Amino acid sequence: ADTIVAVELDSYPNTDIGDPNYPHIGIDIKSVRSKSTARWNMQTGKVGTVHISYNSVSKRLSAVVSYSGSSSTTVSYDVDLNNVLPEWVRVGLSATTGLYKQTNTILSWSFTSKLKTNSIADENSLHFSFHKFSQNPKDLILQGDASTDSDGNLQLTKVSSSGDPQGNSVGRALFYAPVHIWEKSAVVASFDATFTFLIKSPDREPADGITFFIANTDTTIPSGSGGRLLGLFPDAN
């Protein structure tokens, strides 16, 4: 199975697998059962921003979700990613819909990782930034139903020609280049990721959610990982 670390924006509470009984953001370490969650006042039809950061000194993974003009939601969890992830990974975004649905539209996405060592070549870093997504992106690996549209947005799950969300959809987008996320001799390994998103839904209860995730480089969508498993996990263990 893939090794996954993720930050989830979970719009639909699945209390049977340990979700709190409200929309929430959470940090997932190798399981969809979040290690830490915070209540998320989700606003459909409004653009939101997610900022995720980690550094190996504090060993704290944290995420902040905000909408302009309203208060933000923060979640964090202390974890040593050296002990969880392989040295080389890919970073991606995933989303799913189920019986209930929502658009999982990504408007922009940026990422920076840095490895500081004591050697001569002091810093090894990777940076990318998408402010618009091209129609046939060469620098993204699109999986499942993910596609880019003529407006320059990334649609992680299926939408109709009129832009309405479709049910039972799963899609992911990964940056094409592997990321050197940690190294034995690194003094500090850190990363920052930011993305903006738009969730719209005709349903009273939108579903299912969007994630930012880090995984082994050959990661694929696990069979049966739709809906509440957010395109990341084969089961709810």
Curated annotation (Swiss-Prot):
Superkingdom of this protein's organism: Eukaryota
GO molecular function: calcium ion binding; D-mannose binding; manganese ion binding
Record key words, sorted: Calcium, Hemagglutinin, Lectin, Manganese, Mannose-binding, Metal-binding
Record-listed Ca(2+) binding positions: 10, 12, 14, 19, 208
UniProt-annotated binding residues for Mn(2+): 8, 10, 19, 24
Pfam families linked to this entry: Lectin_legB (PF00139)
Record's comment on post-translational modification: Concanavalin A-like lectins of the Diocleinae subtribe undergo proteolytic processing referred to as circular permutation. The propeptide is split into an N-terminal and a C-terminal part, the gamma and beta chain, respectively. These are then religated in beta-gamma order to form the mature alpha chain. The beta and gamma chains can often be detected in cell extracts. Residues 1-118 of the mature chain, as displayed here, probably constitute the beta chain in the propeptide, residues 119-237 the gamma chain.
Record InterPro entries: ConA-like_dom_sf, Lectin_LegA_CS, Lectin_legB_Mn/Ca_BS, Legume_lectin_dom, Leguminous_Lectin
Amino acids binding a carbohydrate: 12, 14, 98-100, 227-228
Stated pH dependence: Optimum pH for hemagglutinating activity is between pH 5 and pH 7. Activity quickly decreases outside this range.
Activity under varying temperature: Hemagglutinating activity is stable up to 50 degrees Celsius and is lost after incubation for 1 hour at 80 degrees Celsius.
Family (UniProt): Belongs to the leguminous lectin family.
Role noted for this protein: D-mannose/D-glucose-binding lectin with hemagglutinating activity towards rabbit and human erythrocytes. In rats, induces dose-dependent paw edema. Has low cytotoxicity against Artemisia sp.
Self-association state and partner proteins as the record states: Homotetramer; dimer of dimers.
Any further remark recorded for this protein: Binds one manganese (or another transition metal) ion and one calcium ion. The metal ions are essential for the saccharide-binding and cell-agglutinating activities.
Protein name: Lectin
Organism of provenance: Macropsychanthus comosus
Species classification: Eukaryota, Viridiplantae, Streptophyta, Embryophyta, Tracheophyta
